[in-house]
């Protein structure tokens, strides 16, 4: 298995990482989450909420797409939203860890999708 890429220390919506393995290319991109708000959860300090209101941090989602040798298999293959971005200094590590788990899981999904496509192609010949 190839080394898993990581987001930079302070990722922003629009940033992405790409992982290539065995002809597959999986991309995890950060997208802005305009639905989730800190008031929906317990545990945020008043200061954290004020920083969120002042755009000091935001919620994001990670969206994964999968290709095989340039052919798009799944877009999106997976989506996960409601993730904190910029609240802590280690946002890049936090999002990279989540993206890595998603990429590994979706790699298996992409292989299954490719197998289905090959079966369909072989039965129609």
Q: What would you call each of these model-derived segments?
A:
Residues 1-125:
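Acidic interaction surfaces
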């Amino acid at each position: 298995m190839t080394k898993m890429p990581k987001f930079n220390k302070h990722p922003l919506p629009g940033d992405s990482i790409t992982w290539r393995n065995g002809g597959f290319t999986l991309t995890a991109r950060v997208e802005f989450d305009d639905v989730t708000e800190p008031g929906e959860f317990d545990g945020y300090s008043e200061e954290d909420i004020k920083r969120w209101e002042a755009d000091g941090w935001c919620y994001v989602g990670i969206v994964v797409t999968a290709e095989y040798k340039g052919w798009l298999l799944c877009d999106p293959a997976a989506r996960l939203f409601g993730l904190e971005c910029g609240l802590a200094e280690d946002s890049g590590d936090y999002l990279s860890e989540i993206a890595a788990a998603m990429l590994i899981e979706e790699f298996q999904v992409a292989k299954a999708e490719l197998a289905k496509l090959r079966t369909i192609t072989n039965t129609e010949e």
